[in-house]
Amino acid sequence: MTRIAYLDCPTGISGDMCLGALLDGGVPLDYLQHHLQGLGIAEEFSLSWHKVEHQGQQASKAEVQLRAHGHHHHPPARHWPDIVALIQQAGLPLRAEAWSLAIFRELALAEAAVHGVAAEQVHFHEVGATDALVDIVGTCLGLDWLGIEELYCSALPTGGGTVKAAHGRLPVPVPAVLQLWQKFHVPVYSNGIERELVTPTGAAIAVTLASQFGPPPPLQLEKIGLGAGTQELPLANILRLWIGQKATQAAVPQGQDGSDRVEEIILLETQIDDLNPQAIGYTMEALFAAGAVDVFTQAIGMKKSRPGVLLSVVCTAETVESCETVLFRETTTLGIRRSQQQRRILARQIQTLDTRYGPIRLKIAYQQGKIVNVQPEFEDCAQVAKQQDLPWQQIHQLALSTWYQHQPSP
């Protein structure tokens, strides 16, 4: 059976909460310490854990104690290439290495988008420090030790307020977290707590490794790991890691196995013939930021023989108002057609594949438990193609062929 895990995050997610949940779930501390030494930064930290209590519930608190560094006593800040080099020379298990590199890549891309620089030029501050390296690599080591093949995650709370960062005070969620949520279309909500609940490290772990966000998948629960956060909150500040076996087809009622599902959507449409084409691209980005599931355009002919654009927006009942607001604000339209439809969705998961040029994520679609489509992620292929100065198509084909080579013969 497939071993899976579910990140239940009622008060958010951070790297140390993930580590605590894994240690609480049975991952040996000495195993993590042994492999983390390979990073070559053992003199910078010590790792330990202990039991704490939040709202009457016991959980495990992972502690990454930083050691003094020179006169200023600050852990070193690092660039993305520095982190890649540390991870690649550490001799980690293959999955742990690939996952760690993928998580830091998403962090670099998010920070690059926020600051308007190339990913290689991103100067990590909080997320590039020693404790984040330990949190991310340690989390990947723990998931690999547990034999987790699929990871799922709950919707994430937004938090609120402000937080002190290297560039001054930032609103919560911080820009890098928002960038990750937007890129991966993460479902979020407010639980009324005005604190930083999701850190950049925690967000990157979730979006990179989780194949789906939402309610827990069908599983036979074997163990729960409870990872404590640092803050005292109105709710028990605990991340709950559900560990178990994926439920078999026979164990799940028909239509609830996640192989495919039907959900209600809303289609918004408007025809435009008097808008600067440059504004269309901006509007599409704004619609995705407002929660649109998909946005697309079609060239059409309109009255008086004018060429125009049919702008279509797929959204949910929860985001329809915000999407309509964007359309009225950013375009010249005077009206929007709204229709309720259904869509059928195949189950899918993201797998990170270790190729000779680096890790590449693939999206795998299932129908009735069988694989029906495999596609490498475009952005991963593009990033590797640029780094290696190779054609995108060559990297795309390499990822597919490498994946198929690792599959068992029928």
Curated annotation (Swiss-Prot):
InterPro entries: Ni_insertion (IPR002822). Keywords: Nickel. Gene3D superfamilies: mk0293 like domain, Transcriptional regulatory protein pf0864 domain like. Belongs to the LarC family. It comes from the Bacteria. One of its GO terms (molecular function) is nickel cation binding. This is Putative nickel insertion protein. Signal peptide: none annotated. It comes from Cyanothece sp. (strain PCC 7425 / ATCC 29141).
